[in-house]
Structure formats: structure tokens, C-alpha cells
């Protein structure tokens, strides 16, 4: 048998297999691989980026779904509404474009894309939350500059379920600054609503709101 590495450590293995083909030739195959043994499991977070826009009449479905998920799972559901409208951040939209086929859309942990309705989000959340988490990230302190500055200083630490120094892997932090309840005087801030007057059934209160 193969001995597993110590908990939290990694080990390299070389496996060689020899067999004889139909022409009686001896064939030797060698595989080199590494194995990590996870030492402990950290609490997993589910990050959902929602592609949305005020021009999108079906996007209230995503607004309702994201709100419901945050209320139900406040500690491990991280929802980020990524707007492609007057509130657009070009760099962010460009970053998620490879995942987007249409709006509204939910991108789950940058691996799965799906409709952001409440039942669909909940179903995918249940699949994601049981996956093992190999690291824990903690923000100790965040300092924002003055109103004219774009600088943010963040003190962050992380722990790994394996020896990250020996693993020779390239890990990076990604931070997202969000702003809630953004309002403006332009009509471009008004949400288009195809669920007005009950069209499409109940939608978290949007069925009672105007169409724009």
C-alpha cells in the first residue's frame, strides 16, 4: 500500500507499472504525483456574484433571491450584485464577462453559473457548503482613506489545512468593496420590473411595484 503523508503535510509519489502488450512487448509507465493530506476543515463560504442591471426587467428575480439567501444564511453566504448599468464598475464587469450568457445570472464560487431565483440558489448552496474548505481568511482591520482617496489598507491573515509553504502553490487574496442602497436622481437608477401588476406571479413584493 501507499503510506499517506502526515496530517497537514504533502508528499511526492512515483508509481511505476509494467505490463505486456499484445505483441509481447514489455511496457513501463511511470507517474509522478503529489498528495496533500488536509489537517482540518474550516467553515466554508459560498460567494455568489449576481450579474444584474436596472435595465433588466427580469433582474428583480435575482434581487429577491440574493436577499432571501443572505437572510437565511447570514454567516456563510456572501452575495455581490455586479451591475452593468449606471452603477457599473468596468473592471468587475470585464472580470465576470467570461461567465455571463445573459442577465440575470448567478456565478457561484466562480465555478457554476445558474439562474438567481431563490430555489435554484438554495439548491446550489447546499451542494457548495458541504465541500471541504482548505483555508480560513480573516480580516483583522480595514482602513479607508479620506473621501478623495482610493486607497484601502487591509490587515489580513490566513490559515491552511496543509503546509502551504511546502506545497509551492501561488495563493492570492481578492477583496470586493460593496455599497448598498445606492440611489440617484437619474431615471437610469430605476429598476425595470417585468413582474409589475402580478405578471409572472409573486416575486418578493415586486409584483406590487411599478414597472420602472
Language model feature labels by segment:
Residues 75-212:
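Short, conserved sequence motifs used for protein processing/export or organelle targeting and
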Residues 26-44, 196, 200:
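Short beta-strand elements
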Residues 9-15, 152, 171:
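Exposed beta-strand face motif in extracellular beta-rich ectodomains
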Residues 2-9, 163:
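Short, surface-exposed loop/turn segments at beta-strand-coil junctions that are enriched for proline
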Residues 38-77:
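Local sequence-structure signature of Cys/Sec-based thiol-disulfide redox active-site neighborhoods
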Residues 19-26:
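Short, solvent-exposed loop/turn segments at the edges of extracellular beta-sandwich modules
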Residues 6-10, 41, 147-149:
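Surface-exposed coil/turn segments at beta-strand junctions on protein surfaces, enriched
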Amino acid at each position: 500500500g501507499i503510506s499517506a503523508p502526515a496530517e497537514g503535510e504533502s508528499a511526492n509519489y512515483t508509481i511505476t507499472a509494467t505490463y505486456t502488450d499484445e505483441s509481447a512487448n514489455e511496457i513501463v509507465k511511470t507517474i509522478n504525483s503529489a498528495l496533500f493530506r488536509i489537517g482540518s476543515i474550516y467553515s466554508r463560504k459560498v460567494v455568489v456574484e449576481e450579474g444584474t442591471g436596472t435595465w433588466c426587467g427580469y433582474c428583480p428575480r435575482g434581487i429577491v433571491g440574493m436577499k432571501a439567501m443572505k437572510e437565511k444564511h447570514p454567516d456563510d453566504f456572501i452575495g455581490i450584485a455586479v451591475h452593468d448599468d449606471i452603477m457599473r464598475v468596468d473592471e468587475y464587469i470585464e472580470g465576470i464577462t467570461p461567465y455571463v450568457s445573459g442577465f440575470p445570472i448567478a456565478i457561484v464560487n466562480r465555478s457554476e453559473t445558474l439562474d438567481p431565483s431563490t430555489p435554484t440558489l438554495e439548491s446550489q448552496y447546499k451542494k457548495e457548503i458541504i465541500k471541504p474548505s482548505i483555508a480560513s481568511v480573516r480580516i483583522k482591520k480595514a482602513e479607508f482613506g479620506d473621501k478623495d482617496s482610493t486607497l484601502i489598507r487591509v490587515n489580513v491573515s490566513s490559515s491552511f489545512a496543509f503546509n502551504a509553504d511546502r506545497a509551492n502553490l501561488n495563493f492570492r487574496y481578492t477583496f470586493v468593496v460593496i455599497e448598498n442602497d445606492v440611489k440617484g436622481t437619474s431615471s437610469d437608477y430605476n429598476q425595470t420590473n417585468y413582474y409589475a401588476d402580478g405578471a409572472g406571479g409573486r416575486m418578493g413584493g415586486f409584483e406590487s411595484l411599478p414597472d420602472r
